[in-house]
Amino acid sequence: MDFIRAIILGVIEGITEWLPISSTGHLIIADEFIRLNQSAAFKEMFDVVIQLGAILSVVVLYFHKLNPFNKLNPADKQKTPREIQLTWRLWLKVLIAALPAAIIGLPLNDWLDKHFYHFVPVAFMLIIYGVAFIVIERRWVPNHEFSVMNIDRLPYRAALYIGLFQVLSLLPGTSRSGATIVGALLVGVSREVAAEFTFFLGIPVMFGASFIKILHFFKNGNSLSFEQFGVLLVACIVAFGVSMVAIKFLTDYVKKHDFTFFGKYRIVLGIILLIYAMFRAFLG
């Protein structure tokens, strides 16, 4: 039965990790109805592994763009010295943007999860950022031209600014992609570049967070049975495959549409969560 639950949760992670609708919010809902019959430590490891599956999809999809080493590229896809230089610059921008989350997130992440990983805080963050998306798209964007239409032209200062917005995503329900896309739009980055940079920014942030949590899991004397390993592997593969589709969908979607739909979706989901939380509290 856990294998079926793992597949469902992998699908949810694969879709919601990259769309700006909060993977945490959806996983909280899923956990209410699709609980894994496992320990709390394993569930935390499970969340880490499905995130790894999601981020590996970015590495695979954008390997050539992100790879500065020609030795790892096919003969027909060798980069010019200029392209290699731009790739290194892109990585520098990604690392600059990742710094605020690393500095602030490491000491606060567990505390924030403990105090805010609940229905009501998540619901409010869903609604707040849903409203933000709608306001930015309807009020801000029409009065400001996009100044960054190519990721190679993204200024280092803008990368840092986007990274500061990513810190806000430490609050469950915010959405890492949602926070960074909002920050990118406010500094004049086009929707396409905002989405793409968000994908890349997830690599050091999510790999780093996953490494720390995996280390913490085994350091505390936990181990995995053969069945548990199988559950993790299945969920990781599903999250990887679904993420590939979700990333392709979002990159195509933002070429013709804005983020208003996602804002409305977040608001509706947030309201549903609040109603459910009140209903559950009423029933005791």
Curated annotation (Swiss-Prot):
Keywords: Antibiotic resistance, Cell membrane, Cell shape, Cell wall biogenesis/degradation, Hydrolase, Membrane, Peptidoglycan synthesis, Transmembrane, Transmembrane helix. The keyword Transmembrane helix applies. One of its GO terms (molecular function) is undecaprenyl-diphosphatase activity. GO terms for biological process: cell wall organization; peptidoglycan biosynthetic process; regulation of cell shape; response to antibiotic. It comes from the Bacteria. It is a multi-pass membrane protein. Its EC number is 3.6.1.27. It is found in: Cell membrane. InterPro entries: UppP. It is an enzyme of class 3 (hydrolase). It holds the Pfam family BacA. PANTHER family: UNDECAPRENYL-DIPHOSPHATASE. Catalyzes the dephosphorylation of undecaprenyl diphosphate (UPP). Confers resistance to bacitracin. NCBIfam families: PRK00281.1-2 (NF001389), PRK00281.1-4 (NF001390), PRK00281.1-5 (NF001391), undec_PP_bacA (TIGR00753). This is Undecaprenyl-diphosphatase. It comes from Lactococcus lactis subsp. lactis (strain IL1403).
